[in-house]
From Swiss-Prot:
Cofactor, how bound (note): Binds 1 lipoyl cofactor covalently.
Catalysed reactions, as listed in the record: N(6)-[(R)-dihydrolipoyl]-L-lysyl-[protein] + acetyl-CoA = N(6)-[(R)-S(8)-acetyldihydrolipoyl]-L-lysyl-[protein] + CoA
Species classification: Bacteria, Bacillati, Bacillota, Bacilli, Bacillales
The keyword Cell cycle is annotated on this UniProt entry: no
Identification of the protein by name: Dihydrolipoyllysine-residue acetyltransferase component of acetoin cleaving system
GO biological process: acetoin catabolic process
Length: 398
């Protein structure tokens, strides 16, 4: 009897999965565990393996088509076998095939250069079909991995070189796929379905900056982690959320759901998009433990090692544009969260202290919140609590 292969559920929040490319065609023999297709959903590209040995006798979902988890995408059976569709209940999650985690390239002693190259299966197949030299491609994915966008851009450049003079060239149309498609949908959904408001505040972190410089070398020596201002701000946010739980909530189905634990989402920028790894039960972590988790999660995200479960489930998020010189901005909520904190670029400025003018380091903070769940006064009180922690930082290390 033919075996049905379905779109796997990569995470609790997954609603649709896209078949990026088929590695096999109808009539091809397959081995158990062999990759038959690549799928992408929720910012992650993965492969689907054949659950049994046999022949690919039918493909139900075309390349580029999106379907819900549990939908049959193909059938594997005997070469002359016909497919008998099963009617009734959807496939249970326990019976769904397991998707392979993002491909990790291993340095095997006898491997060829082709095998050692960091490239996604989709990108490799498109490049080889088009006759592109893989060695000439520059990867922009995590860890320098060559992704689909790199190949499509290289093909576009190749066509451009063979096209009309520069003065006659037209604007380039870039299809919105993969991670960018997910980000676009979620950001539009966030703004359309919530009442977002951003308030700002400045904290004098002169004492904190001095403390950070004193503690960071010791932390690196003992624990292998440098302490940054972001780590202190994150710790302050966790403490402030415990005192102001309305910011650690969801607005869903006309109900406000407050969470007993702080699952902190820390936005990480990638070459081709943005992901938000989650630090669970952040309220149970010390400053150094929180710093280690933030650093490790960011590293895994940039190297493409973060799984789908590590990229969802946050109750409050933090994003930092300070490295780009941005001071205040309006972060967009990560639905269904009620709040997101934006960290700006610190700067030195003269400040009055009594009758004296002193040099102080100022850190701009921007808080976006959902006005359906939280009013302006509680949001301002949360920022005020953060300001207090940052200006008197002893509590952050206790």
């Amino acid at each position: 009897m033919a075996v049905k292969v379905v779109m796997p559920k990569l995470g609790m929040a997954m609603k649709q999965g896209e078949v990026s490319i088929w590695n096999k065609k109808v009539g091809d023999p397959v081995e158990k565990g062999e990759s038959i297709a690549s799928i992408q959903s929720e910012k992650i590209e993965m492969e689907i393996e054949a659950p049994e040995k046999g022949t690919l006798i039918d493909i139900k979902v075309k390349e580029g088509e999106e379907v819900p988890p549990g939908t049959a995408i193909c059938y594997i059976g005997d070469a002359n076998e016909s497919v008998q569709e099963e009617a009734g209940a959807p496939v249970a999650e326990d019976n769904m095939p397991q998707a392979v985690q993002p491909v990790k390239q291993e340095n095997k002693p006898a491997a060829s250069k082709k095998d050692r190259m960091k490239i996604s299966p989709v990108a490799r197949k498109i490049a080889e079909k088009a006759g592109l030299d893989l060695k000439q491609l520059k990867g922009t994915g995590p860890g320098g991995r060559i992704v689909k966008d790199d190949v499509t851009k290289a093909l576009a450049e190749q066509k451009k070189d063979q096209a009309k003079p520069v003065s006659e060239q037209k604007a380039q149309e870039i299809p919105v796929t993969g991670m960018r498609k997910v980000i676009a949908a979620r950001m539009q959904e966030s703004l359309a379905n919530s009442a977002q408001l951003t308030i700002t505040m400045k904290a004098d972190i002169t004492k904190l900056a001095t403390l950070q410089k004193q503690l960071s070398p010791t932390a690196e020596e003992r624990y292998g982690t440098k302490l940054t201002i972001t780590h202190f701000v994150s710790r302050a946010a966790v403490l402030a959320l415990q005192a102001h739980p309305v910011l650690n909530s969801f607005y869903q189905n006309e109900r406000i759901i407050t969470h007993p634990h702080v699952h902190l989402g820390m936005a990480v920028a990638l070459e081709n998009g943005l992901v938000v790894p989650v630090i669970r039960h952040a309220e149970k972590l010390s400053l150094i433990e929180l710093a280690q988790s933030i650093s490790e999660n960011a590293k895994k995200a940039r190297e493409g090692r973060a799984g789908s479960e590590e990229l969802q489930g946050s109750t409050f998020s933090i994003t930092n544009l300070g490295a780009f010189g941005v001071e205040h901005f309006t972060p967009i909520l990560n639905p269904p969260e009620t709040g997101i904190l934006g960290i700006g670029a610190s700067y030195d400025t003269p400040v009055y202290q009594g009758e004296e003018i002193v040099r102080s380091t100022i850190l701009p903070l921007s808080l976006t919140f959902d006005h359906r769940a939280c009013d302006g006064a509680p949001a301002a009180a949360f920022l005020k609590a953060m300001k207090t922690y940052l200006e008197e930082p002893a509590a952050l290390i206790l």
